[in-house]
Amino acid sequence: MRGTLIVTNDFPPRQGGIQSFVHGLACLLPPGQVAVYAPAWDGAKNFDARQPFPVIRHPASLMLPVPSVGRRAAAALREHDFDTVLFGAAAPLGLLGPVLRRAGATRLVALTHGHEAGWAALPGARGLLRRIGDSVDVVTYLGEYFRSRLARVLSPQAAARMVRLAPGVDVAAFRPGPSPSAGPAGSAGAAGIRQRLGLAGSPVVVCVSRLVRRKGQDTLIRSWPSVRSVIPGARLLLVGDGPYGPDLRRLATGLGVADAVTFTGSVPAGELPGYYAAGDVFAMPCRTRRGGLDVEGLGIVYLEASAAGLPVIGGDSGGAPDAILDGETGYVVPGRSVTVLAERVGALLADPARAQAMGRRGLAWVEQEWDWSRVAGRLDAILRGTSYRPVPPGA
C-alpha cells in the first residue's frame, strides 16, 4: 500500500461526530502515506496548517459525486502516487469509485455511519447504496444494527465484504483523576467547573451533545420533576449548543425546573473531559425520529463518559446500544419514556456505590475494546486487505 487518499465531506474544522471520526482515522495513518480531500470551511486554513498530512480543499462547502469533484480527487490520487481511497462516508461520494479506479486506485473502502440507514429505507436511494457497495472493496459498519440494515440493500457479494470499524476513544484524555471529583488537571477540571456553575455538593447528571431533538434532552428535562422528588438536590448539566436550545429552556421553565438545569452552550473539545468528570451520571436518551430516517449512529459520547468513569444511560435509537453494556456499564432505556428514564437516573443517584461500580466497568471495557490503538489495527488491516488480530490488553 503506497498511501491513502481520504475523500470526505465530513472533516474538521467543521464540528460533528463523523468529522471527528474521520480526522481520528487520518491521524492514525503514517505521515507521508495519507492526504485528505475535503470541502472548504471557515477556519480551514489554520486547521490544515496544524495537521501532519496535506489537506486539499474543494472550493465549495459541499462535494457531490459530479465530474468536477471526480477530476480533483483523481488528480490528488495521482499527485501523491497513492493506490488506496477511503471514502469518509459511503453515501454519496462512494459513487466516485469507478472514476478513482480508472485513476489508479487498487483498493476502495467506504465508511458508513448512521445516515445510510435512512438511505436504505428509501426506495430510490437503495439502488445508489447498492451501486456504491458493488464499486468498492469494503463497506464498513459501526455495529450490528447498521450492518443488518445495510446488508439488506447491498448485493450478497458486497454484504459479505462488510467489516466493522467504529470510532475510538482517547482513554487517557478522559480517564478519571485520583478522586471522583478531581477530574482532569487545569482550569477546566471538574471541581472548578462545579464551583463555577454552582453545582458544588450537588448530585449531577451530565449530557454532552448537540441540542437537537433526536438526542433527547427534552426527555431528560421532563424527567426532572420525578428525579427531584427522589433526589431533591439533583442537578442537570446540558453541555453543548444547537437549534433546540431555546425550546429546551422554555420547557425547563414551564416545568418549574429551570433552577436545576444548567446550559453551558458550546464548549471547546479540549475542555470536555472536565465537563464529563463534573457529573456523577451521564445520560443521553436518544430516540429514533422521522420513521427511522433519523437515528443515532453510535453515540461516542457514551464511550467518552465511560472513559471518564461514569455510569451511562442511553436511548435505544440506532447503534447507541452498541456503546453500552446494559446492566454493566449503564442502562439502555426507551428513548421516549420519561418514566423509565427517571427511575434509572434516580436509582443511580441514590446508590453511589452501584454507580461507581458501573463506571469502573465502563472504563475497563473502553480500555479493552474502544481505545484508538485498537482502531489503528483494524484500520490498517482493512486498508491492506489483511486479517486483524488484536493484541491482548497489557501485552
Model regions: which residues?
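Conserved donor-binding/catalytic core segment of Leloir-type glycosyltransferases
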Residues: 188, 194, 199-215, 221-224, ...
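Acidic donor-binding loop of glycosyltransferase active sites
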Residues: 260, 266, 277-295, 310
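Short hydrophobic beta-strand element within catalytic cores of glycosyltransferases
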Residues: 283, 302, 307, 311-314, ...
